[in-house]
Design a protein with these regions (language model features):
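ABC ATP-binding cassette signature C-motif
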Residues: 1-262, 311-569, 574-641
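Short intracellular "coupling" helices and adjacent cytoplasmic loop segments at the cytosolic face
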Residues: 110, 276-288, 305, 432
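Short amphipathic coiled-coil heptad-repeat segments
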Residues: 142-148, 273-277, 295-302, 598
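Intracellular alpha-helical coupling/juxtamembrane segments of multi-pass membrane proteins
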Residues: 249-274, 286, 290-300, 304-306
Length: 641
């Protein structure tokens, strides 16, 4: 065991964060700390590292072990470059190397006992340097920086010029390079693109120390952790397994506890009814038996009713009208912020009902495309047009569509003046804003709260074409699942940018990967994208070996993606047709199976089986149904392949 938290207690006034919870982390164990927004995850991490004092209990770190903590906000030395700042994580090793080089120079001018003394020091230092893998220090720094999405050209960038997200990546790099015995990470995937998240997953999987991580990224948690510690309603509960295992076990546990509670309540009601009946007999024996049952009830240990969180927002997305089949047509679009080219000459179409995800590395122009489509930015060249009857609903990750000086209530009432006060409060309550909360200024809200206001406006817009920029940012896992459910039931069209692979996998019917200034299309969800990308990578690798010219192979791959655009559109249309046919077949099978079951019930009724004419009619109908079902089952199997 490397870390143990015993009977931890913490409250801020009347708000209880933890009420006597305990958990532990074993050596080399990878654990997640999960819970709704505001449950106290970050507060608990700060208690563990000593930034916040617990009201009770204690935190024990095994003697001699080191702990590293990545907070959501970090301080930086603005006078250094990115590389210099990250290099400070290896200060001890670099100082050791400096001493070794100095002794090497000294020994050139020494002899006798003094030389022997310095030689012993030199051997001791070089042995320690090798143990710490000092000779690979610089390459390790470079590898971590590249893994976190920095190019070598960016290594010399001054820290003072970096964005908040870039500074967070620098801090994460420093922490990883210090290699403490246990890492505490608070939302480490924030500001990372898909490639960097994948790199971090692999790094942490191979990390020799222990890990306690706060994250809302389910793919990430599923791949990295083997234990989940839940903080909810002031209680700490430990579940073995990854996030999916935790979610299943939690639901099973909740159902079991509710069943136990309901069974006991039913038993209590039954006993009380029996007691009342016995007393109504008004006989000595009956009264004694009633008293005996009352004593039994008094001794019964009450099962506590499972507490349920009432913190789930309610989101329903319904378009007010149906758009034309062609929702968006983009032709030869280009954009650059010199000297950087984001994308050039891109063309694509989006049809009604599609859910399209745009993915790609940070800085490739994904959000820029959405801003161009919403006329926030202008393209350098090219054009786009919307189809007939298209109404856009826009979700901006930076929430520029919100007004910082307005209250939440004003934000809704000004945009939707037809809603009365009661209707506005009802909408806001669905997004967890109640009482005086509705009079908070937008500028004073957290990122998650602003996200909920933006989602409320999106719901009220009744748009039939949703354009969403990182819609899951700042949402807890439950809220993400609610958004996924709403989008999957949405009958309109969706175009979004996201780094949340689980979200993409659940909601996308098509993925456009922005790579090498153009789009590569994948008609499917994220799992399909990974599968096809591996095939493309293998094909690219084979081409490279055959031609021994990687640049030529890259050009060929990009050219192929452009040449196959028409084929991809045809394949997409074919897939939509197959999906529609598959759905119709399933629905018809369901109708026939229901009717078949009805016939079975009817033929078992006396008024039917004694009526030969009715029996023959039903038998004939049943035979026709069976024949049609046989055909439909075969068709379903073909369409499912």
């Amino acid at each position: 065991m490397i870390l143990a938290c015993h009977n931890i207690k913490k409250a801020f006034g009347e708000e209880v964060i933890v009420s006597g919870g305990s958990f532990h982390i074993e050596d080399h164990e990878k654990a997640a700390l999960v819970g709704p927004n505001g449950a106290g995850k970050t507060t608990l991490l700060k208690m563990i590292v000593g930034e916040i004092q617990a009201d009770g209990g204690n935190v024990v770190l095994t003697r001699g072990k080191t702990m590293g903590y990545l907070a959501q906000h970090q301080d930086m030395n603005n006078d250094r470059t990115i590389y210099q700042e990250v290099r400070t994580a290896k200060a001890d090793i670099l100082d050791m190397e400096r001493q070794i080089r100095e002794i090497e120079q000294e020994m050139k001018h020494l002899s006798g006992e003094r030389l022997e003394e310095r030689m012993n020091t030199y051997q001791r230092l070089t042995a320690a340097f090798e143990r710490e893998n000092g000779y690979a220090c610089e390459s390790e720094i470079t590898g971590v920086l590249k893994g976190l999405g920095f190019t070598e050209e960016e290594f010399a960038k001054p820290v003072a010029t970096l964005s908040g997200g870039q500074k967070t990546r620098v801090s994460l790099g420093k922490l990883l390079l210090t290699k403490p015995d246990i890492l505490l990470l608070d939302e480490p995937t924030n500001h990372l693109d898909l490639n960097s998240i994948s790199w971090l997953e692999t790094y942490l999987l191979n990390y020799p120390g222990a890990l306690l991580i706060v994250s809302h990224v389910r793919y990430f948690l599923n791949r990295v952790v083997t234990k989940v510690v839940e903080i909810e309603l002031g209680k700490l509960t430990t579940f073995m397994g990854n996030y999916t295992d935790y979610a299943k076990k939690k639901e099973m546990l909740r159902e079991a506890r509710m069943k136990e509670y309901l069974n006991q309540q039913q038993e209590i009601k039954h006993q009380e009814a029996v007691i009342e009946k016995l007393r109504s007999f008004n006989r000595e024996k009956s009264i004694k038996r009633a008293e005996s049952r009352e004593k039994m009830l008094d001794k019964m240990t009450p099962v506590e009713k499972p507490m349920e969180l009432h913190t789930d927002m309610h989101l329903t997305l319904e378009p007010s009208c149906v758009s034309g089949n062609d929702v968006l047509i983009v032709e030869h679009l280009s954009k650059a912020f010199p000297p950087q080219i984001l994308f050039e000459n891109i063309s694509f179409e989006i049809k009604r009902g599609e859910h399209v995800a745009i993915i790609g590395d940070n800085g490739t122009g994904k959000t820029t495309i959405l801003k161009i489509l919403n006329q926030v930015l202008k393209a350098d060249s090219g054009s786009f047009r919307l189809g007939s009857n298209v109404k856009i609903g826009y979700y901006d990750q930076e929430h520029h569509v919100l007004h910082m000086e307005k209250t939440i209530f004003q934000e809704i009432s000004d945009d939707y003046p037809n809603l009365n006060n009661t209707q506005i409060r009802k909408v806001l309550a669905a997004f967890l804003f109640t009482g005086d909360d509705v009079f908070k200024l937008i500028g004073d809200l957290s990122g998650g709260e602003r996200g909920r206001v933006s989602l409320a406006k999106l719901m009220l817009s009744e748009a039939n074409f949703l354009i969403l920029d990182e819609p899951t940012n700042h949402l807890d896992i439950t809220s993400k699942e609610i958004l996924e459910h709403a989008l999957n039931n949405y009958t309109g069209t969706v175009l979004y940018v996201s780094h949340d692979r689980y979200f993409i996998n659940q909601t996308a019917t098509r993925i456009m990967d922005l790579v090498n200034h153009t789009f590569v299309n994948y008609i499917g969800n994220y799992d399909y994208y990974l599968e096809k990308k591996e095939e493309l990578t293998a094909a690219y690798s084979n081409t490279s070996r055959l031609e021994n010219n990687s640049s030529s192979a890259t050009t060929d791959l990009a050219s192929d993606s452009k040449l196959s655009w028409q084929e991809q559109k045809e394949a997409q249309a074919k897939e939509r047709k197959r999906a529609n046919e598959f759905k119709k077949t399933e629905e018809r099978i369901g109708v026939l199976e229901d009717r078949s079951a009805e016939i079975d019930i009817l033929m078992a009724q006396e008024e039917v089986y004694t009526n030969s004419v009715k029996c023959q009619e039903l038998a004939k109908e049943r035979a026709e149904i069976d024949a049609e079902l046989e055909t439909l089952y075969e068709k379903w199997e073909e369409l499912a392949e």
